[in-house]
Each structure stands twice: as structure tokens, then as C-alpha cells.
Amino acid sequence: MADVDSHLAGGSLVSRGFYSIVRNILVFLCLVVTRVRVVDRHKVPASGAFILAPIHRSNIDSPLASAVTRRRMRFMGKDSLWKVRPVGWVLSALGGFPVSRGTADREALKRCVAVLDSGEPLVLFPEGTRQSGPKVHPLFDGAAYVAVKAGVPIIPVGIGGSERVMPK
């Protein structure tokens, strides 16, 4: 977990540059493949920490979520993604960190608060995992817990049509 922790306090200049390059490529590809339209972008804080809480239907949701702001977005991902070395390295370099699903992963919650305390925004999918269909599934309370602990707002985000672009 040391590699993950090294990226929590703002990340290195290389990590930030890597994020910017990858984000721009992914957002460009999303714009080419989809009809991305961001509504009420002005409601996303230009500075300070906040939690971006999108609905999760597809693997394309994370890059789409980063389209709402040019700021670096930090995120959690299922820990199994970090077990594949190159994937885990890339996710960590992009500002991600693992969460053990199915348990109350206190370390991941502490990392969330640390990211927010450092002033960076954080993407948390309140449904916990990718779901199917247009209905919003029951939400886990992790995003609300972290928001209260860190004293930051939650910005809800709806993403329509991503399941058609990249099905579960």
C-alpha cells in the first residue's frame, strides 16, 4: 500500500502530468465515441475539495466523470484491479487507490478523507459498483460518511447512455 499512499498527498509533478495527458486523451476519445454534454458545469467547484458522486453503469463512467472539470480527480477502484501490476501502477499514477469491496474498508475511507483534506476532489460511485438499467440502485453511505468527516460538499452526477457505449 506504500505506492498508493505516496500518491495521496497531491502526487508528484510527473504523476500530475501523466494524469493530465491521460485525462485529455480519454476525454477526447469519449467525445469522439459519445455525445458528451455537461450540464451545469458552473456548479462544480473551481477550487477546494468536494466529492463527485456519479451513477455507475459502465467502465467509461470514470473518464466521463473527469470531463466535468480540468482539475485532477482522485478515485477509488476495486482492489482486484491493483493485482494486475501494470494496471495497478497506471491507476495509482492517475491518483487512484484500491478499496476492498464487501467490507467496511477503513483504510480506504481514511485515504478518501486524506485526499479531501489535501484539497483535491474525489470521485465516489455511491452505488458501489456498476449497475444495470435506468433505475438508481440503493446507495451506500460511504460518500456521505466521508463528506461529513472531511466537511466537503457532494456533487451528484447523472451519466446517461454510458451503458450503451460500453456495457457491463
Per-range role (PLM):
Residues 1-17, 79:
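Compositionally biased, charge-rich terminal segments
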Residues 15, 23, 31-168:
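Soluble catalytic domains of membrane acyltransferases
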